[in-house]
Regions:
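Conserved phosphate/anionic-ligand binding catalytic regions in large, soluble enzymes, centered on
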Residues: 1-4, 47-51, 198, 278-283
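An N-terminal, well-structured beta->alpha segment
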Residues: 1-35, 168
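Glycine-rich phosphate-binding loops that contact phosphosugars or nucleotide phosphates
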Residues: 24, 32-172, 189, 224-267, ...
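Internal active-site segments that recognize and position negatively charged phosphoryl groups
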Residues: 173-198
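Active-site diphosphate/adenylate-binding microenvironment
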Residues: 206
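A structural supersecondary motif
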Residues: 212-217
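Phosphate-moiety recognition in structured ligand-binding domains
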Residues: 251-315
Length: 315
């Protein structure tokens, strides 16, 4: 069994632990209350930052997701009257580290959401992962963001149902998406456009399959033209107002011979649907890697020349 598979199976229990132990959440909420907030991350943490912005806007917070590199090199970045929520699996990435140092030096209040024992963590998520394909730390970061938004006044629904919703997916039958001959496309509406982006990232880094993930309207206006019978379109339905548009796009693609899978998130509302749908795209990535015989844990370092190429870049 891969490390990714083991970690995915551990998610429900780790999420229950986070619901039981909210250390740091209330204190962070008080530091950030009444401020415009920047949510910053890289890779999977960038997807969490965008979903977190949806949660925080439900609390009436002005929330701005920004890529870590962009914040450091270009801006915008938080100033004195604003706050920073920084997301990092291990607290070691180049630009998130630089941004955190700068923010603290300038007196910007922060909430650092990271793995257990990670440098600078103010709100801890999961046990630090051994697989390069981050899963539990992502669902954990989303739960911490939901808790933070709730502490700031958001009514997101019953967070105590999140672990069981994730368990139903990771412990259930295979999702069963057959690897396409060419590309795997993920689309979603509302917050689940970022679940779609996470699905594409996971499929690429675990199974080495060409993939893209985006909002359903963005997909329709251009990218959909390139999708054909050698591809697979995966539609992530969170049950919100964009669901009808998602169904229209799915029907249109299917009528052109594109293999289409519609996956619904079993949750009380669209915002909480990101949890079971994230678990679903994790399973799709893992199942694709297992079918194709790739190593989902290695970040491609077992591919000839890839390890030495990556060693020349500071992540």
């Amino acid at each position: 069994m891969s490390l990714m598979s083991e970690t995915m199976q551990s998610q429900p229990e780790q999420l229950r632990g986070m619901l039981a132990d909210t250390t740091g959440v209330d204190a962070a909420a008080e530091r950030l209350r009444g401020r415009s907030l920047f949510l910053v991350g890289t890779g999977t943490s960038w997807h969490a930052a965008n979903i977190g912005a949806w949660f925080l806007r439900a609390a009436g917070v002005e929330a701005w997701p920004v890529q870590a590199m962009d914040a450091v090199l270009y801006g915008p970045r938080p100033a004195g009257g604003e706050g920073l929520i920084l997301l990092s699996h291990k607290g070691t990435k180049t630009y998130t580290t630089q941004l955190l140092e700068r923010a603290r030096a300038e007196g910007v209040p922060t909430a650092v959401i990271s793995g257990q024992g990670a440098p600078g963590a103010e709100i801890e998520t999961s046990v630090v992962e051994r697989s390069a394909a981050y899963t539990a730390s992502h669902t954990g970061a989303m739960l911490r963001l939901a808790q933070l938004a709730t502490a700031l006044g958001a009514d997101l629904g019953p967070l105590n149902g999140v672990p069981d919703a994730v368990a139903e997916v990771v412990e259930g039958p295979a999702v069963g998406v057959v690897p396409p001959r060419r590309a795997m496309e993920f689309v979603g509406a509302g917050p689940n456009q970022w679940t779609a982006a996470e699905g594409a990232l996971k499929v690429r880094e675990t199974a080495y399959v060409a993939s893209a993930g985006m909002g359903v309207e963005q997909f329709l206006h251009g990218p959909s033209v390139a999708v054909g019978t050698d591809d697979t379109l995966i539609c992530l339905d969170g049950g919100g107002p964009g669901g009808e548009r998602l169904a229209q796009v799915a029907r249109s693609a299917g009528s052109a011979g594109v293999p289409v899978r519609m996956i619904a998130g079993d949750a009380p509302n669209e915002l909480l649907s990101v949890f079971p749908l994230t678990a679903a795209v994790q399973r799709i990535a893992l199942e694709t890697a297992e079918t194709l015989g790739t190593n989902p844990d290695s970040f491609g370092r077992d591919v000839p020349a890839r390890a030495s190429a990556l060693d020349g870049i500071a992540l």
